[in-house]
Amino acid sequence: MDVTRLLLATLLVFLCFFTVYSHLPPEEKLRDDRSLRSNSSVNLLDFPSVSIVALNKKSKQISRKEAEKKRSSKKEASMKKVAQPRTPLSAPCVATRDSCKPPAPACCDPCASCQCRFFRSACSCRVLSLNC
């Protein structure tokens, strides 16, 4: 009985050994210095060629005009965001970052909302969106 267990154990060890080493990639054997040099050097023909094109004055002016248009549109968008009126604050409210457990009133900031963590044991008013 002990001999069969010993044989089964060695068979199991050899099977594990062969399965592990059969999945590993075979190692490359370098026979001389020439193969070492060819494997280590980078072949420049493998990379695509790069062409350098000089910009003429028209394309530079167009790109400057486009950049100015983008800047002006960003400024207009920021001006529109600032011009939006805020709703008046109600008297019974919770300030931002203060505790707002469910029986408490709503948050003072219209962009803030009450966020609860740890199974509604720790709640606080937080601003979720910066664009509000």
UniProtKB/Swiss-Prot annotation:
Annotated Gene Ontology cellular component terms: extracellular space
Main localization category: secreted
Task: Provide ranges: composition bias, Basic and acidic residues.
Answer: 63-79
Disulfide bond sites:
C93-C108, C100-C114, C107-C125, C111-C132, C116-C123
Respond yes or no to whether keyword Disulfide bond is given for this record: yes
Stretch forming the signal peptide: 1-22
Q: Which domain of life is it from?
A: Eukaryota
InterPro entries attached to this UniProt entry: Agouti, Agouti_dom, Agouti_dom_sf
Keyword Disulfide bond listed? The answer is yes
What are the record keywords, sorted? Disulfide bond, Glycoprotein, Knottin, Secreted, Signal
Agouti domain residues are 93-132
Q: Which residues are glycosylated?
A: N39
Outline the segment boundaries, as ranges, of region: Disordered: 62-93
Location(s), subcellular:
Secreted
Q: Cross-referenced SMART domains, in alphabetical order?
A: Agouti
GO process annotations (BP) = hormone-mediated signaling pathway; melanin biosynthetic process; melanosome organization
MF (Gene Ontology): melanocortin receptor binding; neuropeptide hormone activity
Its domain comment says: The presence of a 'disulfide through disulfide knot' structurally defines this protein as a knottin.
Function of this protein? Involved in the regulation of melanogenesis. The binding of ASP to MC1R precludes alpha-MSH initiated signaling and thus blocks production of cAMP, leading to a down-regulation of eumelanogenesis (brown/black pigment) and thus increasing synthesis of pheomelanin (yellow/red pigment).
Q: What is this protein called?
A: Agouti-signaling protein
The taxonomic lineage of its organism, from the top, reads: Eukaryota, Metazoa, Chordata, Craniata, Vertebrata
Q: What gene name does this entry carry?
A: ASIP
